[in-house]
Amino acid sequence: MATENGAVELEIPSSSTDTAPKAAAGEGPPAAEKDPGPPDPQKDPGPPDPEKDAGPPNPEKELESPDPKKEPDPDSTKDTEAPAPEKGDGASAQPSASSQGPEGEGGLQGEPAEGSAGQPAALPQETATAEASVKKPEAEQGTPGSQDPGEAKEQKKVAEGQAPSKKGSPAFLHSPSCPAAISSLEKPLAEKPLDETLELIFEGVPVTPGPTETEPAKVAEGEKNLPGGSQKEGEEKAAGHAGQDGVQGDTSRGIEFQAVPSERSEVGQALSPTAKEEDCFQILDDCPPPPAPFPHRIVELRPGNINSQFSLNSKEALGGGKFGAVCTCTEKATGLKLAAKVIKKQTPKDKEMVLLEIEVMNQLNHRNLIQLYAAIETPHEIVLFMEYIEGGELFERIVDEDYQLTEVDTMVFVRQICDGILFMHKMRVLHLDLKPENILCVNTTGHLVKIIDFGLARRYNPNEKLKVNFGTPEFLSPEVVNYDQISDKTDMWSLGVITYMLLSGLSPFLGDDDTETLNNVLSSNWYFDEETFEAVSDEAKDFVSNLIVKDQRARMSAAQCLAHPWLNNLAEKAKRCNRRLKSQILLKKYLMKRRWKKNFIAVSAANRFKKISSSGALMALGV
């Protein structure tokens, strides 16, 4: 049933669900190739001299008379150490046609690793990297004295169980290519009950322990290797642990781009300095945002007279929908300007929903989430008084002719949305109606945004199954359309769609009507339009590909999003990224179509009311 604000309630949810047969786990790195040949035991009966003979010892000779004093070759550990591929490797850029799963449209590869909370196992291209890291024959390496000092240092790291140092950013989980173009429907994901993994994946909590103090920190991308680099890395790591607050404290530990433990540690440590970056929106703003109009407060619904405390301005409407209308108001005692959400009490369930919304908002003390000021109940309605946000909708702001939208602007907006979502999920709250209309700018000049409208939000317990059948079709996830169990990853799908629209100005699943839109969501067939995404970075495409994934277990959590390379090092990116995105022009067309649809619904409702009143039906009812 469609409503004025675009949200619909799915009256007859589809009972069809997508099942995925279990895929075989990826094979480990291949064994090392044999050396050119052992020395002749007749010519060289004694043990090989490492200074004179670079060839390997005779295996038969060692089996007959093993030397108890002989120490294991430290280079032999290379056979099992396979560093994860870096971004830009040829293997990662061209995945095989059979490496994609039907549940993962973003290029998910392989079966989820055991105990990795739904994260995919080591990527197939790691095999190629492993072959390159296999120990060379000693004849090729030369004598120990002739070995390069840098090579010896790397081999020592490997022997101690540490990952060799590498330059560049961590490898991406998915290919940044178009999911439709890389045959994402060919290889299925492993079938695993969702309720077995919810407790692990919720809030982006990693299954494996975080990096220890003995693990080496990875140099951030673009940083030069100075002589005192190791000391600098240790200082940055300590500052990262001390500076992160309660909300973003898990950011450096939550992301798992690879299934290799050493790589996960390096990723977390490389991103921890930028994960604690303060006020990302101030990178683009010349002045700080206005302070919060009032501190966070715990609100209780109480009866009272609205007109004695507030002056409602019904002519200055801010929005409306199924649950009521929103207008501006002023508190008479303080002169504080607020937004008033008026909800009609038609059934007992209406009051129950309002009480749930109040309970949810009392938990959300975050600068990127709208704050509740008061709640008053009258005999016929309930009014929620909230923080007034004057900047308007985010999409309305960025289509302004005087505004130049760049990819860095999009990063700043998306990072703040992720911050708000992460806090909600830590408070066990799911928004379930994330869409452009519910992202507002604090003012008309800055880049600070807030998430609003918790009328459809739900408290969430990972140990309990939760299903919903409402939302806005364009931004609904497949599990909502199918009336399947939902989780915190349901909000992440909506974030992926919003990010896609910010980058391109196109809605990936929008059809001619709601039915076609819902069918598009269920099929999850989408792609990166070549023309509109021409100027968009591969990191941005990879970010979206990790969110718009049909299987919710394969989507990134909010913590993993905040640790993704695309949302980090924003200050450096802002210095070199000033190209205007084409999405501004296309977003104007999208907003015009949306306004036309809203006006059409309003006019249709007025015409229906006019026909009913002219037929005398209302008079017969005594109205």
Curated annotation (Swiss-Prot):
PTM annotation (Phosphoserine): residues: 169, 175, 177
Residue list for modification N-acetylalanine: 2
Domain (Protein kinase): residue spans on this chain: 312-567
Residue positions, PTM Phosphothreonine: 472
Record keywords: Acetylation, ATP-binding, Calmodulin-binding, Cytoplasm, Kinase, Nucleotide-binding, Phosphoprotein, Serine/threonine-protein kinase, Transferase
GO cellular component: cytoplasm
InterPro entries per the UniProt record, alphabetical: Kinase-like_dom_sf, MLCK2_STKc, Prot_kinase_dom, Protein_kinase_ATP_BS, Ser/Thr_kinase_AS
A GO BP annotation: cardiac muscle tissue morphogenesis
Region (Disordered): 1-179, 204-251
Similarity comment text for this entry: Belongs to the protein kinase superfamily. CAMK Ser/Thr protein kinase family.
Function: Implicated in the level of global muscle contraction and cardiac function. Phosphorylates a specific serine in the N-terminus of a myosin light chain.
Protein name: Myosin light chain kinase 2, skeletal/cardiac muscle
The organism's taxonomic lineage, starting at the top: Eukaryota, Metazoa, Chordata, Craniata, Vertebrata
